[in-house]
């Protein structure tokens, strides 16, 4: 069994440092209005802007959004094509404003399946915002959590085969350094909209000790009020990371008296 020392307890605050969100419900939102699914995705893009605004206002340092999973390539081709066009137009339209507001944009996932113009826009957005530090916005696109772990494991195996690494050197910390978002704190709060209560292959390694919060609200209707409900719930939780409540209290006392 891993000792508590393997999982250092991060400082706990009312506002999470890193929020990860599965943005679910765009299609159902459109269907309830008897509109094409792409209309729901467009409405969902506006919810992304509201969420970024909220995070900037509250001082959240990292926001990771699940935009398109590796499994989503199996959706109807017309919907995939519409999503790719929406993604491309959103980058053209929004990156300048994100740059002005100090937001750093990153993408995680297998971008090789995207068309060259979209890959170029993604790389350009990363370059133009790389120096920004108010908020790190990571967009998971063509991403899968299992794929992420497998890619990290393969990289470690290649290092062992090349003699750069010994098998006994591989531990949780080393694997953590090879998965996506390795340079960011692990997500403190995970939010999923749309009513489903699962994490759907999103950040499987990174969410090990994350607080989970689910809402029936469909993503296009997600706003500051719902986001504040999530933060209020988060602020009332005790994050123990495998320790006891007494140990957490002792650590808090040590920190405050240091």
Curated annotation (Swiss-Prot):
Positions bound to substrate: 25-29, 37, 41, 69-71, 73, 75, 192, 198-200
UniProt-listed Enzyme Commission number(s): 2.5.1.31
Cofactor binding, per record: Binds 2 magnesium ions per subunit.
Keyword tags: Cell shape, Cell wall biogenesis/degradation, Magnesium, Metal-binding, Peptidoglycan synthesis, Transferase
InterPro entries: UPP_synth-like, UPP_synth-like_CS, UPP_synth-like_sf
PROSITE patterns: UPP_SYNTHASE (PS01066)
Subunit and partners: Homodimer.
Family: Belongs to the UPP synthase family.
Protein name: Ditrans,polycis-undecaprenyl-diphosphate synthase ((2E,6E)-farnesyl-diphosphate specific)
Lineage, broadest ranks: Bacteria, Pseudomonadati, Pseudomonadota, Gammaproteobacteria, Lysobacterales
Gene that this sequence comes from: uppS
């Amino acid at each position: 069994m891993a000792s508590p020392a393997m999982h250092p307890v991060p400082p706990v605050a009312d506002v999470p440092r890193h929020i990860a969100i599965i943005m679910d419900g765009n299609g159902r939102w459109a269907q309830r209005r008897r509109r094409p699914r792409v209309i729901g995705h467009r409405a969902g893009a506006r919810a992304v802007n509201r969420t970024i605004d909220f995070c900037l206002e509250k001082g959240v340092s990292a926001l990771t959004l699940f935009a398109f999973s590796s499994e989503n390539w199996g959706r109807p081709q017309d919907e995939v094509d519409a999503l790719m066009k929406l993604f491309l137009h959103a980058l053209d339209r929004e990156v300048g404003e994100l740059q002005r507001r100090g937001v750093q944009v990153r993408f995680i996932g297998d971008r090789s399946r995207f068309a060259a113009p979209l890959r170029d826009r993604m790389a350009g957005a990363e370059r133009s915002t790389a120096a920004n530090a108010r908020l790190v916005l990571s967009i998971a696109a063509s991403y899968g959590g299992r794929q992420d772990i497998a890619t990290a494991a393969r990289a470690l195996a290649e290092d062992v085969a090349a003699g750069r690494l010994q098998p006994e050197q591989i531990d949780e910390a080393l694997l953590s350094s090879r998965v996506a978002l390795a340079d960011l704190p692990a997500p403190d709060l995970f939010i999923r909209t749309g009513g489903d209560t699962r994490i759907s292959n999103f950040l499987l390694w990174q969410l090990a000790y994350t607080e989970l919060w689910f809402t029936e609200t469909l993503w296009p209707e997600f706003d500051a009020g719902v986001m504040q409900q999530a933060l209020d719930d988060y602020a009332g939780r005790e994050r123990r990371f495998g320790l006891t409540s007494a140990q957490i209290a002792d650590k808090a006392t040590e920190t405050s008296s240091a």
